């Protein structure tokens, strides 16, 4: 039997620009901003520390908090600012030009990040509620803080 290679789309609980905390992996405990979300891979790319809010819950960056820079819902991944940094060796493009080493944020699976409240410095799960006007918004379960304006 062949494996099903079609990508599975997962609903991500984080969006680009959210602040998250890493809850697993080598960056556990870091806080950063989500740069990019990869829903197909169920991963996120996180950037920076103590900027917005998402907490990483697994992996080498476990515990780090950062802002979600990019959400990739087709891959179920996100990119968080300053978290899961990888080095890439780039060959020279032209003769006489030297090669270089570039550092960039790699995607993290969305299940390894939690939304983070910068006001109360606590990571929390998300629930959905409706405002008085009938608009559906995201809310942190622990703090009751509304995320979407």
From Swiss-Prot:
PROSITE patterns noted in UniProt: RIBOSOMAL_L24
Organism domain of life: Bacteria
UniProt key word RNA-binding: yes
Pfam families hit by this protein: KOW, ribosomal_L24
InterPro entries named in the record: KOW, Rib_uL2_dom2, Ribosomal_uL24, Ribosomal_uL24_CS, Ribosomal_uL24_KOW, Translation_prot_SH3-like_sf
Keyword Ribonucleoprotein listed: yes
CDD domains: KOW_RPL26
Family in the record: Belongs to the universal ribosomal protein uL24 family.
Job of this protein: One of two assembly initiator proteins, it binds directly to the 5'-end of the 23S rRNA, where it nucleates assembly of the 50S subunit. One of the proteins that surrounds the polypeptide exit tunnel on the outside of the subunit.
Protein name per its UniProtKB record: Large ribosomal subunit protein uL24
Taxonomic source organism: Nostoc sp. (strain PCC 7120 / SAG 25.82 / UTEX 2576)
Top-level taxonomy: Bacteria, Bacillati, Cyanobacteriota, Cyanophyceae, Nostocales
The encoding gene: rplX
């Amino acid at each position: 039997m062949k494996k099903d290679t079609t990508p599975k789309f997962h609903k991500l609980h984080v969006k680009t620009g959210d602040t998250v905390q890493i809850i697993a992996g080598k960056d556990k405990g870091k806080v950063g901003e989500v740069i990019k979300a990869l829903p197909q891979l169920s991963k996120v790319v996180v950037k920076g520390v103590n900027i917005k809010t998402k907490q990483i819950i697994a992996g080498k960056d476990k515990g780090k908090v950062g802002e979600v820079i990019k959400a990739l819902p087709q891959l179920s991944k996100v990119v968080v600012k300053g978290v899961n940094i990888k080095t890439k060796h780039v060959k020279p493009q032209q003769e006489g030009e030297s090669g270089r080493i570039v550092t960039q944020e790699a995607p993290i699976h969305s299940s390894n990040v939690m939304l983070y409240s910068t006001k109360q410095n606590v990571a929390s799960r998300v629930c959905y509620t409706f405002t008085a006007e009938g608009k559906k918004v995201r809310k942190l379960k622990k703090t009751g803080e509304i995320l979407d304006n």
